[in-house]
Amino acid sequence: MSVAVLAFGLNHTSAPVSVRERVSMPVDLVKPALAGLRSAFGGAVREAAILSTCNRTEVYCAADAAVAEQLPIWLADHHCMEAGSLHPHLYRLHQNDAVRHAFRVASGLDSMVLGEPQILGQMKDAVRAAEEAGSLGTLLHQLFQRTFAVAKEVRSQTEIGAHSVSMAAAAVRLAERVFGDLGQARTLFIGAGEMIELCATHFAAQHPRSMVVANRTAERAESLAGRFSAGTMKLADLTERLAEFDVVVSCTASSLPILGLGMVERATRQRRHRPMVMIDLAVPRDIEPEVGRLDDVYLYSVDDLGRLVQSGTDARRAAVVQAEAIIETRVQGFMHWMQSREVVPVIRGLHQAAEDVQAAELERARRLLARGESPEAVLEQLAHGLTQKYLHGPLAALNRSAGDERKQLLAWMPRLFPGRDSRR
């Protein structure tokens, strides 16, 4: 059975954050998941890679096409979910659609922030994890190498990333909606990853009254805080100190909420009900969604920011058209490469069969020469034997065929076995 490129998963357009957080995979769980996927399907899934970010969880496979319908069931089972609850949010892509999707994702065309560059790095991390897990083979390796090349081509030849509103900039805008000038705002960042670093950069440009970084690893918190003359604190101190802050931006890799309803409710009472902006960029979420019901708290999720960053998309519509044209050309190129791979075993088989005939006829000729036969007679017998073997296959196929099959064979014969007329 031929191997197909398959992709399935969900993203910010097909599933809300409440669903995405249930299938999100931290980096340390990706390799075990890949091992479980290949084990569940045996040889039917030859290669696999998993891309899991705040906005998407996707699985790319080189697999037998017959298992395509069972793959989403595995994803649901892996996360202890009912397949029916996940099914409405999933997309399943096959062959050129899967290839096109990979190219679009890496190029930023499928991102919440159109043209954002972070997704390319995240996809490279996913490929690295698959390589380390031993689940990347020739087909997916070629797919992702071409994916990265396409993303570079799109970004260098179009303005897909120009004039975009980043998630970090959107976070600042949301805080400004509540407080106006942020010059007097005390800002807390929970986490110390790339997204928090971007947010800290944008907030620092507004010169807030103070900035503090809280992170599980003190060394990383101090490193980030040092760039912005910010303070640091332990996550364990959140309960006591949360009330100090007007703006809280959180993005960690925690599998459970860090800020619960009770903790935030106590903080609002200590603040005497002064407003608090809380921006949760994590998937799974760092802040319990029930916090948004509190009168004095303005809670925004990653999806809320996504709606804000859609502004400016119209201005980049021409760049999108250019990018899609580049991608379509490269999709066709990859599919041609895949089709050429399917021919390779046939060509090898033909060469091997021809070499076997050649070896047998040469051995027969040597025996005849050893017995004293004249070289001229041996050469004639060698030529005759090769001719008979050459013609045996096609003539036997013609003799066995009938009707439409015979018509097709007759039509192909001049191309497969060009005669004197075809060389004129």
Swiss-Prot record:
Enzyme Commission code: 1.2.1.70
UniProt entry tagged with the keyword Oxidoreductase: yes
Functional pathway: Porphyrin-containing compound metabolism; protoporphyrin-IX biosynthesis; 5-aminolevulinate from L-glutamyl-tRNA(Glu): step 1/2
Active-site residues per Swiss-Prot or TrEMBL entry: 54
Other observations noted: During catalysis, the active site Cys acts as a nucleophile attacking the alpha-carbonyl group of tRNA-bound glutamate with the formation of a thioester intermediate between enzyme and glutamate, and the concomitant release of tRNA(Glu). The thioester intermediate is finally reduced by direct hydride transfer from NADPH, to form the product GSA.
Family: Belongs to the glutamyl-tRNA reductase family.
Function: Catalyzes the NADPH-dependent reduction of glutamyl-tRNA(Glu) to glutamate 1-semialdehyde (GSA).
The protein's assembly and partners: Homodimer.
Descriptive protein name: Glutamyl-tRNA reductase
